[in-house]
From Swiss-Prot:
InterPro entries: Rbsml_bL25/Gln-tRNA_synth_N, Ribosomal_bL25/Gln-tRNA_synth, Ribosomal_bL25_b-dom, Ribosomal_bL25_C, Ribosomal_bL25_long, Ribosomal_L25_dom, Ribosomal_uL5_bac-type. Belongs to the bacterial ribosomal protein bL25 family. CTC subfamily. One of its GO terms (cellular component) is cytosolic large ribosomal subunit. Part of the 50S ribosomal subunit; part of the 5S rRNA/L5/L18/L25 subcomplex. Contacts the 5S rRNA. Binds to the 5S rRNA independently of L5 and L18. GO terms for molecular function: 5S rRNA binding; structural constituent of ribosome. Pfam families: Ribosomal_L25p, Ribosomal_TL5_C. This is Large ribosomal subunit protein bL25. The lineage of its organism: Bacteria, Pseudomonadati, Thermodesulfobacteriota, Syntrophobacteria, Syntrophobacterales. This is one of the proteins that binds to the 5S RNA in the ribosome where it forms part of the central protuberance. Keywords: Ribonucleoprotein, Ribosomal protein, RNA-binding, rRNA-binding. GO terms for biological process: translation.
Length: 199
């Protein structure tokens, strides 16, 4: 599915013009990248809100059409940062990063767990420690999920990034020793074992 958004160039900056944009249901934005000049933009608030809701936590390429001075130019971008008012929860600003399609980038990709762990069947608890992992890939090859098979995970065991590197078809850039998911003993199990040993 193509994800598209139309932005307008803007020449005025500062708090006053930014507030005026928000009153008109527009969100101030900026476009930048390694091969592009920084451009100030504005985007429709409702369209941005719907787009972010549909995207969820996934890092996806966005087709941003930049309109201004009677011209329109399409850019391939990622959303790098969205600033939200801490109380009113309205959008304050958004950063778009223009990506060269032939240059690898690092993005955050959500983790998806597959299967029921052996340890859970024994009464243990499954803990997802890292909900997102860093992936290096070309912009057109961003995976939707990092799938992790946890069916063989027993109580007291974990799966680390290093173990996933031999399984997934893309590069993981997080520390190899970082635990992604584990299964822990049921609460109170250690106490019960100690009491049984004393008896």
């Amino acid at each position: 599915m193509d994800i598209e958004l139309v932005a307008q160039t803007r020449t005025k900056s500062g708090k006053g013009p930014a507030r005026a944009l928000r009153r008109n249901e527009m969100v101030p934005a900026v476009l930048y990248g390694p091969k592009a000049e920084t451009v100030s933009l504005s985007v429709p608030r409702q369209r941005l809100e719907r787009l972010l809701r549909d995207m969820g936590e996934e890092s996806k390429l966005l087709r941003l059409t930049v309109e201004g001075d009677g011209t329109a130019e399409m850019k391939q971008v990622l959303i790098r940062e969205v600033q939200v008012h801490p109380v009113r929860r309205r959008f304050l600003h958004v950063d778009f990063y223009e990506v060269p399609l032939d240059h690898p980038i690092v993005v955050e990709v959500p983790v998806e767990l597959l299967g029921e762990p052996v340890g859970v069947k024994k009464g243990g608890t499954l803990n997802l420690i890292q909900r997102m992992l860093s992936v290096r890939c070309l912009p057109g090859e961003i995976p939707e999920k990092v799938q992790v098979d946890v069916s063989k995970l027993d109580i007291g065991s974990s799966i680390q990034v290093e173990q996933l590197r031999t399984i997934v078809p893309f590069e993981l850039t997080d520390d190899g020793g970082m635990a992604v998911v584990n299964v822990v003993a049921p609460e109170g199990a250690g106490k019960e074992d100690a009491e049984a040993a004393e008896e």
